[in-house]
Amino acid sequence: MKRRIRYMALVLVLCMLALTGCAQPRDTMTVRVCLDAAPATLDPAMASSDAERTVVAHLFENLMKLSRGEDGSIQPVYAAAKSYTVEDNLDGTETYTFTLRQNVRWSDGQTVTAHDFVYAWQRLADPATGSPHAALLDMVAGFDQVQSKQDGSLLQVSAPDDFTFVVKLSYKCAYFLTDVCAGTATMPVRSDAAEREDWSLHSETLLTDGPYRATGWDETGLTAQAADGYYDARRLGPDVLEFRFETDGQARADLLSGGDVDFAMNLPEGDTSDPYPQTTLLLLNQRTGSLESESLRRALALAIDRNALTEGQPLDPAQGIVPPGLRNTMGGDFRQGSGSLVDNEPDNYEALCQQARTLLEEAGGVKAAGQITLLYDSTDETAAQTAAAVQDAWKQKLGLIAILRGATAQELADALNQGEFMVALTTVTADRGDASGLLSLWESGNGYFYSTAYDMLLRAADASGHVEVRDAYLEDAEAMLVEDGWVIPLYYVHRHSGLAQQLTAPLYDGTGVYRFSAVVRQAAQ
């Protein structure tokens, strides 16, 4: 009898606790985000700006998603996929088999299936789509055939059933899960939605499968609410995301300081300096034959004062080709792990210039060097200032005459593709978060550099099954370009952002995308 009374009392207490919980629901959490532009599209295959990709990252859900580990590294975790297996094939290829969750829903209530991923990936690779991100799938078997035959169906992805997605890779790819399966360009797309004109331009027609649903969208902003029935709802921080669009940097800063937004990206100044996947550098054209002397190339590199180039600007002197923020194989920072390839110590600059003059003499002196032509984008003010500063440094420190040749951005791009330049000032941008996203630009097939040794290092990195060995190959490849003088890194771009003090920081992936789904309010100090 006493046991029965104790049992009934326990049931009563539990009921009271449940009723108390129902009577006091948690406050709705809204995070207000100020982006630096209004999205022109939210089609995952076409979204290119940081603002577009940031919004896409919240409205869509890929096979995997990014999470920050306890050591600070960025790692992929399961999202629309609940598991996967990897099979090594006898021909050196790999086959990934993903098993999808059966409770991931499109915004109209239909279930997300493997066929949606097949359609999205083949559509992304198809030249007819015109996606700027098609090369992100270059490791998938059949990609080259898709490009040559203009047929997306040749991409070797398949759906044996509604919840099994199979991908065959033509080579091992260490960043496949992180940068492809958790990227924004490869998000699933449903064919009946994407075949409608302008489907991704209005909240009424936008079909998404992510943790948030667009409930309002105009030229000033977009509101997204947590999706009903989202499988991982308990891990979501914000209930509502309010994206505000503001193109003026100072106006974004004023909105943040005035408490009108909780986060603002790309500020003139800010609390946080976020690395960006771009490096401005000088390309020396190997194919012209006029820069064959390694001593001359090294002299040109040593005579440049990177600290002077970046003073007073949101730029950092480059330590190598790969900027901070791009990841190594373990998910850590490649630049931090590999160290600096360039001496930017101000006190050492004059000694470096003396070394440069010695190297120039070894190369035959000023007369042997001849006249150097430097191609640059004259429509870009920063590029024009940089070109003039480099020209002056070579004249003052080495006595070399450089002729500046201005061009439009398109003319510069065409000259690079065709190899019609001697030295070019350009900015390279990674299309993925892995360090190879930049280093692959110097593989055979470009118009300005060829090295079988370099190609072998990148192929060895691709084939390596050991993470430290892969990173060592990539580090050696970067060092070859810089130490041989074919690439002269100048500076990195960084972006300032600001965050309200009461919130935890969003996840920043190093490529310009911010993720707010795990942001929560911090306890009062």
Question: How would you label these PLM feature ranges?
Answer:
Residues 35-91, 207:
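N-terminal lobe/hinge region of extracytoplasmic solute-binding protein
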Residues 68, 169-240, 250:
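Gly/Pro-rich hinge or "lid" segments in bacterial periplasmic/extracellular proteins
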Residues 113-120, 162-166, 239-240, 277-325, ...:
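Alpha-helical secondary-structure segments
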Residues 315-362, 380-383:
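Structural transition elements
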